[in-house]
Amino acid sequence: MMNRSAFFVALLFAFFITGGQALAAQDSLFVPVGMSGNESATGIWWPEPVAKKAAKVSKSRIAKRDENLRAVREGASVVVWFHGGMSSGNCEKGFVAGADLAELYPEKIVVSISACRENHWVTRDMIDAVDAALDSVAAGRKAPVERVSLVGISDGTLGVLAYSVEGRRKVDDRLLMSSFGKFLGEPAVLASQKKMQSGRFRFLQGGKDRLYPSDQTVPWITDFCKVVSVDCELRFDPEGEHDWSYWKGKRMDWIREAIRK
């Protein structure tokens, strides 16, 4: 197994040979996975203040820049990305999985945790790992993280739903792409949970999803939205495919609308 030092070297090498397109996380860390003794590879992307060109960099300008940086980070909202393939053997997805989201929402703090093997999204330990990562954000910016928005793709959407019920933070917006909520049981039971009664839900579902057929997913989502007492909407694309690349390439407007500024 590759040790951590070797992994970070490989990660940086891959980043440079691709011209920086991977947008590797500014902070890469390992957070505890509940009481299991395991750790989850986590990436954090921080927003940056708009830089003004200066002929000379003085101490006062550096101090002002640092002050602006602190203010931007303290006031930024936080989005958690739940990647797909939650039971795969790749246990370091979190270091890069949130990169696209960070590009879409440069004004936000993006947090991406790694699920893998038995430490999948629908476990108490992984919910605790998400909160541990958010605790790290709070410590890093010296301001609490009280509310978050959640984005998931494929079985990452199970993490969105599970955190909504079990997580410590209040949830504002939820974006669930190519989901199969039936894995968690009856929609009415899940939708009636007390902690589901806040924020918004946006479901993006495709008619050409190769893994989750729309004749099974759409009725579940429809029933869920009928029961939950908050703003809940299904957006269906008959040509929609399963993968993130489709939604990013074809339905960017839906994605941007789902997570409010």
List the predicted regions and their residue ranges.
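C-terminal catalytic histidine-bearing segment of alpha/beta-hydrolase fold enzymes
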Residues: 84, 202-204, 210-261
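Alpha/beta-hydrolase active-site loop
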Residues: 121-141
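Bacterial N-terminal signal peptides
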Residues: 9-19
